[in-house]
């Protein structure tokens, strides 16, 4: 599992996450603590004996593939090639002292050699997740399926590009799960603060709809607020509220992150180090119903780092259902309670609050198999997907 010194096999959960992201499976509880012609498959001629999906040549072949670029690029961080332990150091504030210049009495001395060691907070990130993929390349068994070497070359290009696309989507899907884990962990902290659980402090989840209804004397639900007569005014208000929090992040405070008991640390996040992810359908609605009707467009154009089409699955795009890893007030990490959340609108966070580090990646080709007439190419990855709850971050929900 994560948060140990080992590098864990992640293929099972990776397959699960990718299937949910691509719609192969519907949303289910995911343990992120561990992370007009219709096409048809019916084939009316003989198949190649090796691949069993390539028709023997008839007239022409369309090679259906295009490069895929992974989303959540904003989570990529510096590559760490050596070791499996990364530490992060931060300074804690000291109390101010009385000025020793006064009073000064006769027969007394001022000690200027008093020792005062600074207080340091060290947080640690351990381990990583390992996974692999491999593909087989045949020497001549596919010759009967193509008309000439050029067409065979196009097939190999498509074949290889498909491998690259799957690798890109694997990183994207795990990065999406990293965000979902962060949202779930922040929700655990907010629930514990609300319940006055000892050691839990700060503000972690902002209920935009509750605040809006309180300030405006309305009783709108998440469904009501998206109606044409309500959405423009709500979105303008929500943008102003989020930008206010963005300004708050620039203040040096202990308010917007988790603190370790006895080692409270003041954080500030300059605007250029703030990232925001916003649910894209609401952003597109705003583009057509709100932004075009304002005199000062820049007022509502938040510098969005990433538009998010869905947080976990396309089937339920605004929802998550995860069992996150979470840091507790004593600084340890535990597997939290399952978090089922809906109506997630946006996530605002310090660039060091979460991310993806590819520790190592490489590929290698096997020797040619003379008996079988093929060779394999293996792709290996060691990734670390991480959250740091001691950095500033807020989750905005339509509740």
Model-inferred region functions:
Residues 1-68, 284-399:
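Extended, compositionally biased alpha-helical segments that mediate assembly or anchoring
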Residues 5-12, 41-45, 49, 53, ...:
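Alpha-helix boundary/N-cap detector
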Residues 51-135:
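Assembly/oligomerization interface modules of large self-assembling protein complexes
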Residues 53, 57, 158, 208-211:
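Charge-rich, solvent-exposed alpha-helical interaction surfaces
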Residues 121-192, 376-380:
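Long, contiguous amphipathic alpha-helices that act as assembly "spine/axial" helices in icosahedral shell
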Residues 137, 206-208, 396:
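Generic detection of short hydrophobic beta-strand segments and adjacent strand-loop junctions
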Residues 188-322:
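Extended, solvent-exposed, turn-rich assembly/linker loops in the middle of proteins
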